[in-house]
């Protein structure tokens, strides 16, 4: 629930997921039975993960997935989704968590885990300022939407409040 005096403008969302090399036989059929296979994977000492840096939203997601498990590679942290995808593509790691667009850019397999939403909360007292009006207008401009879609962001069409 929002506090009084602010307004929510829905922004964009992007899908985060489990990434892996599609030609790695250890991940065959992985997308069909993720939960079951993920448990098996955590007990395989041969599989190396690449983690995200502490404090990132992706790290929060990973820590929630892993619980108390610390698989091989847990201590190796990457600072971006691109770095995670590069590590997996170059076989420095077998799996990680990243956004769909970077997995596709590297030709990696992707199993969706959850969407992240990016919204804007603006004080009502600033709604009429030219910069705020410009931002609100940009949210629905077709060229902006198309460019952001190329980067893996989808316009969040939920209700503004």
Positions of the model-derived regions?
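A ligand-binding cleft/hinge motif common to bilobed small-molecule-binding domains
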Residues: 1, 85-114
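Periplasmic-binding protein-like
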Residues: 12-15, 106-137, 139-160
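Short beta-strand-to-loop elements that line the ligand-binding cleft
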Residues: 69-83
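Short coil/turn segments
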Residues: 21-26, 50-58, 125-127
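Short loop->beta-strand "edge-of-pocket" segments that line small-molecule binding or catalytic clefts
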Residues: 36-60
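N-terminal segment of the mature folded domain
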Residues: 1-33
